[in-house]
Swiss-Prot record:
InterPro entries reported in the protein's UniProt record: His_Pase_superF_clade-1 (IPR013078), His_PPase_superfam (IPR029033), Mito_Ser/Thr_phosphatase (IPR051021), SixA (IPR004449)
Any single GO CC term annotated in Swiss-Prot or TrEMBL for this entry: cytoplasm
Protein name, per record: Phosphohistidine phosphatase SixA homolog
Entry EC no(s): 3.1.3.-
Pfam families xref list: His_Phos_1
Protein family membership: Belongs to the SixA phosphatase family.
Keyword set, alphabetical order: Hydrolase, Protein phosphatase
KW Hydrolase (keyword) present: yes
Domain of life: Bacteria
GO biological process, one term: protein modification process
Gene Ontology molecular functions: protein histidine phosphatase activity
Natural source organism: Haemophilus influenzae (strain ATCC 51907 / DSM 11121 / KW20 / Rd)
Amino acid sequence: MNIFIMRHGEAEVMANSDKARHLTVYGSKQAFLQGQWLKQHLSTLVINSLDRILVSPYVRAQETFHQVNQAFDLELENKFEIWEGITPYGHAHSVIDYLEVLKDEGVKSVLIVSHLPLVGEIVAELYGKRNPISFYPATIAQLLWDGNKSEILMHQASPVIYLK
């Protein structure tokens, strides 16, 4: 199973609650550009698309998915689910358990849009070692997972963007 783990784009510092924080203009652009990169990257693989997308219920993660979906010309619209299990304080073991269910259902590729510290914990759990990736906003890591162990195939940090 190809697993793409993405941290949300740059978010506002202040909001009524952590859950309600929106992406900044910069964060929206990061997410869109990473979506374009991911679409192009998938076209070079046998995968060509994503089977399932898991998105945190937090506003900034949903806005990140929206931008990625825009980059995919809305083709991901019917493939995503909002899951409470991938909020910042979710548990990597629960995520792995759910990935096992998806793998058993025949899902070959998954995008997870979530938060620190969980994104790093998921990588560490799948990889079986300390997470070597710095998850800056909108970073995407790709892991190939066989159900027991995984290897990190690559990671893509968001490019530097100059806003006018």
